Regions:
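Short segments within alpha-helical structural elements
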Residues: 61, 206-231, 385-442
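Sec/SRP-type N-terminal targeting helices
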Residues: 43-47, 60, 107, 118-145, ...
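Bacterial Sec-dependent N-terminal signal peptides
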Residues: 1-28, 36-39, 423, 429, ...
Length: 444
């Protein structure tokens, strides 16, 4: 009894917990805002900006003082020899070279060295290039945001269209179910033939399968939307926007300039990077100037233990200086490199014309596709209304005994086909709207 009660309480808790999970309400704007915070591509693009910031700091660090400490303790188990004339060695035979070992069995060297760059043109150009690279990463982040907004918008519209399709399929299901029951009654009363019932039954079976398929397609569309949002698939959402024909009125607002396209802005940054790359090669012709200093102590002894006798065995040393490096001739290497980078800059300039022509063509194509899709949608909407009228009139005639069952079946098939054509046209118009707004840089 106790176990049964415990199981009942546990089950009740699970039910209450599931009921407590709220369904997330989302408009299209809320969906895009959510995606811009949670989509994995956006998160990776943000990390790229952090990497670029790290590159800037890394370049700054190379211009700061560099300090290093060194400690070297050695056991010279076999000292190298040098050859000296015998005149320097008392008691050695004259005219000969005498091998003499210099050094101690144990030696030590401890030092601290510091250096400071005073002038290096490559450093300053590299620092500027690193900041420009960060700017490029930021613009690529914007491009990722545009791509995500595009994907989310299309997925959001797909859910709305599939939802409307399912609602209409449900109405068709109820309508055909009613027609089937009426036809069966007419058959039982002798006012219809068996073939009339079979025809309606075929249509009813088809709409039953269509309803199941539409339900599954709506689930797939919702899963795709959650994927684009960066949301767990098992989280429940409800879309709050509704599809009306007014949604197509704002797609062609405003004027267009190439700067509105993030690809154009990215190309401008790439041009600056190419110019800085040329500048970097040019400054390699300039001298480099560095300051340096070192302070330490050395020791040499015949006993390893004496190396740790800092007071008596170690002797201080120190130095400071300035170092200038002047490039004189490198076999024309920098000249050849400079020519290559100028060619690459010319390629970037050519890409301006290529990108502008590509944008112009894309806008023209997307605008025509959008206008045509809206016209097609309006025509299919009118066809759907007309086919509905035809079906209703045909059904009334059949119920009044002046029409045939076959006419009703054909009118029903035409009506459902008109519905399918309209929803396909509606979805195509929505996608074309998103594509056109992206082409004119008005999506984000």
């Amino acid at each position: 009894m106790y176990k049964k009660t415990l199981f009942t309480l546990s089950l009740s808790f699970v039910v209450l917990f599931a009921a407590a999970q709220e369904v997330r309400q989302m408009s299209l704007q809320e969906a895009t805002d959510y995606a811009l915070e949670h989509n994995q591509n956006i998160l990776n693009a943000k990390l790229d900006i952090e990497v670029a910031e790290g590159v800037v700091k890394e370049n700054i660090a190379t211009g700061l003082p560099q300090i290093n400490a060194n400690l070297d303790l050695a056991y010279n188990f076999s000292l190298p020899v040098s050859f000296l004339p015998s005149e320097f060695i008392p008691g050695a035979p004259p005219g000969e070279q005498v091998a003499v070992a210099f050094g101690t069995k144990y030696s030590g060297n401890a030092s601290v060295g510091a250096s400071q760059m005073v002038f290096d043109g490559v450093f300053f150009v590299g620092l500027e290039a690193a900041k420009t690279y960060k700017e490029l990463s930021t613009k690529k982040h914007i491009k990722s945001k545009i791509d995500v907004v595009e994907a989310v918008s299309k997925a959001y519209y797909a859910v709305l269209v599939n939802k409307l399709t399912l609602e209409l399929v449900e109405k068709n299901y109820g309508r055909l179910d009613t027609l089937l029951q009426e036809t069966k009654e007419m058959y039982q009363n002798g006012f219809a033939e068996k073939i009339d019932v079979s025809r309606v039954q075929v249509q009813f079976n088809n709409i039953k399968v269509n309803r199941e398929n539409s339900t599954k397609m709506l689930g797939v569309a919702e899963s795709l939307l959650k994927f684009q949002l960066g949301m767990p698939i098992n989280e429940e959402i409800a879309l709050t926007d509704e599809l009306t024909l007014d949604i197509f009125d704002d797609a062609k607002e405003g004027s267009f300039g190439y700067e509105q396209r993030v690809e154009y802005s990215i190309l401008q940054t790439q041009e600056r990077l190419a110019l800085l790359d040329i500048k970097r090669t040019k400054v390699e012709y300039l001298p480099k100037l560095d300051l340096y200093a070192s302070l330490g102590a050395i020791a040499g002894t015949g006993s390893g233990a004496n190396l740790f006798n800092i007071g008596n065995e170690w002797f201080d040393f120190g130095l400071a200086g300035v170092k200038m490096s002047v490039p004189v001739f490198d076999g024309l290497r920098k000249h050849r490199v400079l020519q290559q980078k100028k060619v690459k800059l010319q390629q970037v300039h050519n890409n301006y014309d290529l990108l502008e022509n590509s944008i112009n063509l894309e806008i023209e194509q997307k605008q025509v596709a959008y206008e045509n899709s809206v016209k097609t949608m309006n025509v299919q909407l009118e066809n759907m209304k007309l086919s509905q009228e035809v079906y209703e009139i045909t059904k009334e005639k059949y119920q009044a005994g002046v029409g045939s069952n076959l006419e009703v079946i054909n009118a029903d098939a035409d009506y459902k086909q008109a519905q399918t054509n309209f929803f396909i046209a509606l979805y195509n118009a929505l996608i074309a709207k998103v594509d056109y707004k992206k082409s004119i840089g008005n999506l984000l």
